[in-house]
């Protein structure tokens, strides 16, 4: 299948935006990581029409609403020398591919139920040379440690997967001891938090500041009881 041509974009302009954004987020990235992130934006634009990855077509808005949005959670997830991370409902690879680029010591698994999107994720693994990235297709509630995935995860993240209570119900069996579920949300999800299932609780709520984005963003960390 042939990719349609993406909108023309000045890579230097995008690079300047990315540098400003990562500086605002206090993230020190290498030149190689900056280039990988810019390559990822270009590939999202190139293959979007084929894989139906995002409604956003403008590369600058892709950088802001996808890349910087995903980068805004990095400092809050850090604290482990290495970590096993599952990105549920990853779609075009967000935030998982961004995490794999900026945290090469983490093992990132992308999960989606749509085979076409998994195919794109696998292609990104090869094109961006992400040895720490793996892809698994299927419903998250059907994934079993030691079968579809090697083991349980320290962090399970989602950017646009489901209602928070549903996310916790479906993914909790994959949380490793001491691990957490992390949900990226827009406005503060009071109603969703009120419906959290028994044996789960909010550990912290973080208001995110995404550079160049005038919109509310929150990161919710949920702990689950190991017995559940």
UniProtKB/Swiss-Prot annotation:
Protein origin, superkingdom: Bacteria
Ligand binding (S-adenosyl-L-methionine): 89, 94, 140-141, 159
Catalytic activity: guanosine(527) in 16S rRNA + S-adenosyl-L-methionine = N(7)-methylguanosine(527) in 16S rRNA + S-adenosyl-L-homocysteine
Main localisation: cytoplasm
The name this protein goes by in its record: Ribosomal RNA small subunit methyltransferase G
GO cellular component: cytosol
Subcellular location: Cytoplasm
Listed InterPro entries: rRNA_ssu_MeTfrase_G, SAM-dependent_MTases_sf
Documented EC number(s): 2.1.1.170
Protein family according to the UniProt entry: Belongs to the methyltransferase superfamily. RNA methyltransferase RsmG family.
Keywords, comma-separated and alphabetical: Cytoplasm, Methyltransferase, rRNA processing, S-adenosyl-L-methionine, Transferase
Pfam families: GidB
GO terms for MF: rRNA (guanine-N7-)-methyltransferase activity
Organism: Burkholderia lata (strain ATCC 17760 / DSM 23089 / LMG 22485 / NCIMB 9086 / R18194 / 383)
Role: Specifically methylates the N7 position of guanine in position 527 of 16S rRNA.
CDD domains: AdoMet_MTases
């Amino acid at each position: 299948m042939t990719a349609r041509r993406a909108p023309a974009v000045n890579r230097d302009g995008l690079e300047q935006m990315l540098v400003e954004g990562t500086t605002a987020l206090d993230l020190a990235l290498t030149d190689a990581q900056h280039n990988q992130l810019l390559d990822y934006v270009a590939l999202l634009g190139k293959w979007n029409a084929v894989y139906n990855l995002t409604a956003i077509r403008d590369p600058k808005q892709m950088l802001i609403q996808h890349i910087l949005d995903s980068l805004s959670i990095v400092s809050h997830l850090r604290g482990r020398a290495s970590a096993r991370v599952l990105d549920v409902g990853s779609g075009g690879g967000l935030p998982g591919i961004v995490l794999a680029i900026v945290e090469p010591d983490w093992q990132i698994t992308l999960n989606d139920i749509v085979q076409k999107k998994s195919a794109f994720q696998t292609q990104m693994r090869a094109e961006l040379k992400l040895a720490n990235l793996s892809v698994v297709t299927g419903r998250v509630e059907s994934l079993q440690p030691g079968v579809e995935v090697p083991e349980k995860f320290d962090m399970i993240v989602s950017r646009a997967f489901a209602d928070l209570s549903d996310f916790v119900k479906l993914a909790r069996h994959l949380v490793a001891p001491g691990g957490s579920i992390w949900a990226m949300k827009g406005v503060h999800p009071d109603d969703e938090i009120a419906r959290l299932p028994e044996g789960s609780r909010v550990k912290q709520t973080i208001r995110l500041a995404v550079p160049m984005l005038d919109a509310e963003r929150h990161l919710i960390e949920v702990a689950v009881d190991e017995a559940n």
